[in-house]
């Protein structure tokens, strides 16, 4: 699960969270391999060489928090991921990287990606299979036609 504004946790480093998460999932990935993978992903996303040691989301920009969630998505490799406005706080270059990482994830066998977004470019580039619209009461309607998303983006919700 990814949040619109991830909570900072003092005293817990970015890598400690990943190590504990991987341990709880009982992955066979060795600590040295995990750290190497973490550092590689951080580098690909333009984060500092010391990102693994920084406290989780403490004094991190919105974009850094979102990039951290991408590292978590990649390393934990869940079957289903729910991302709340993953594009929030990202510049245009970071959105391109985000989009590619999310496409790569969604194209893996057996993966489901649920994204909450108001950003037309992200929706267009991800080309979702289905669109689900919730009303104020929480009732949902699912559409196989992606054009409903574009219509809502252009015209807003119609009651």
Feature locations, PLM:
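Walker B motif beta-strand of ABC-family P-loop ATPases
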Residues: 80-82
